[in-house]
Amino acid sequence: MIRFKKTKLIASIAMALCLFSQPVISFSKDITDKNQSIDSGISSLSYNRNEVLASNGDKIESFVPKEGKKAGNKFIVVERQKRSLTTSPVDISIIDSVNDRTYPGALQLADKAFVENRPTILMVKRKPININIDLPGLKGENSIKVDDPTYGKVSGAIDELVSKWNEKYSSTHTLPARTQYSESMVYSKSQISSALNVNAKVLENSLGVDFNAVANNEKKVMILAYKQIFYTVSADLPKNPSDLFDDSVTFNDLKQKGVSNEAPPLMVSNVAYGRTIYVKLETTSSSKDVQAAFKALIKNTDIKNSQQYKDIYENSSFTAVVLGGDAQEHNKVVTKDFDEIRKVIKDNATFSTKNPAYPISYTSVFLKDNSVAAVHNKTDYIETTSTEYSKGKINLDHSGAYVAQFEVAWDEVSYDKEGNEVLTHKTWDGNYQDKTAHYSTVIPLEANARNIRIKARECTGLAWEWWRDVISEYDVPLTNNINVSIWGTTLYPGSSITYN
């Protein structure tokens, strides 16, 4: 009887254990299945990472290659050439409006909005992540675990790491900025966005870039971008995509949030913190030397009194906008003295509590294989160059002891609506008229005069060579003053052409 009771008790306990363990096993299997569904689902996404993040800017089919216009005493030839620009930046500029979508560990979609620097955030329940900061001296204290990696929680964790460095290590470790520099002339919105990897609207709004005036050749603009990086914060890359998601999340949940072959998931792997300085150099000069003049100024070449670039600088202004760093430097600086811009760039280039860092760029990776998500920009643009020509004149002077005749001819250039050059031939009304010493006259030339031909001949009185050339010049350059002089005797004539 006792043995029977023991057997019954053991059987009851075994049955209870089976009933208790069954939900645990089922729950564990459910979690594993959900994780596997995420890993296999993301792994099975079919996309070309170069195509899914392709940015096709302007496509130019036709344009007028040349145009000529008169402006006062000048003739301006505008020459246009089609260019193509292809870039694949991996660090994407951060603007204020996307801070909460571009923090370390943030999940995004690789869609059109990402290409346009307006990333779509993938909002689902998350597992904890580790973030790391590269401030010197922290060593083993450079990492922190964030249980619920939202924008607010991650930002708070970064502040905690930075505060720790300021309290413990800032006195023994200096932190000069790592500077990245890029520059480009402005030709179009798509071109400058691709060249500097920045949203053109930022430049338009903060610097006041007038793209219409640039397109109409009314202004020439160069943009400088200085990225001064104080530190970088990175998120640990997952071994499997499911490592990032709460156990309750399934691949179907991700699909409902927008994950697809056309919009595969990404994670922000690192964010650079520091300050960005955008500088606009703008001029109303139409000189072909504008870019060279601006570059000389940037290099701090001593050219303030340069006659070569004087007109350009007198008609130029400079604007700087600082994002990050000391709040006193945030205001827009507009000046005609580039030394003030240099001061803005030089000041506050070291991280401190009074000169805090600001998120300036980020890099994302595809969850499928942790490969870097690079936006592939391709755009056409028109590069415009202008050449100014001024009016000139020919000063004829004859003091020789002989009868002389002159021939002066030139072409005046214009362009038709297709941009083709049209030449109108012109001649001086005094051509081949006998002139005796002393004779002088002035022949005015329009600024669009080309192919200038000057000939002078003397009457020798010799039957076998009645006329002898004293001057015979083709393609005489147009200058303010073309001084043509002839002198001497019939046997020993003299001549010169000088320019000033």
Curated annotation (Swiss-Prot):
Whether Zinc counts among this entry's keywords is no
Keyword Membrane present in the record's keywords: the answer is yes
Q: Where is the signal peptide?
A: 1-28
Q: Where in the cell is it found?
A: Secreted; Host cell membrane
**How would you describe this protein's topology in the membrane?**
Multi-pass membrane protein
* GO terms of molecular function: cholesterol binding; toxin activity
**Ranges annotated as spanning the membrane:** 189-202, 209-218, 287-296, 304-316
**Which biological processes are named by the entry's GO terms?**
killing of cells of another organism
Gene3D superfamilies the UniProt entry points to: 3.30.1040.20, Perfringolysin, Perfringolysin, domain 4, Thiol-activated cytolysin superfamily/Thiol-activated cytolysin, alpha-beta domain
List, alphabetically, the Pfam families matched. Answer: Thiol_cytolys_C, Thiol_cytolysin
**The organism sits in which domain of life?**
Bacteria
Keyword field: Cytolysis, Hemolysis, Host cell membrane, Host membrane, Lipid-binding, Membrane, Secreted, Signal, Toxin, Transmembrane, Transmembrane beta strand, Virulence
- GO annotations of cellular component type: extracellular region; host cell plasma membrane; membrane
* Motif stretch (Cholesterol binding): 490-491
Q: Where is this motif: Conserved undecapeptide?
A: 458-468
Q: What does this protein do?
A: A cholesterol-dependent toxin that causes cytolysis by forming pores in cholesterol containing host membranes. After binding to target membranes, the protein assembles into a pre-pore complex. A conformation change leads to insertion in the host membrane and formation of an oligomeric pore complex. Cholesterol is required for binding to host cell membranes, membrane insertion and pore formation; cholesterol binding is mediated by a Thr-Leu pair in the C-terminus. Can be reversibly inactivated by oxidation.
Q: Provide the family line.
A: Belongs to the cholesterol-dependent cytolysin family.
Q: How does it assemble?
A: Homooligomeric pore complex of 35 to 50 subunits; when inserted in the host membrane.
What is the protein name stated in its UniProt record? Perfringolysin O
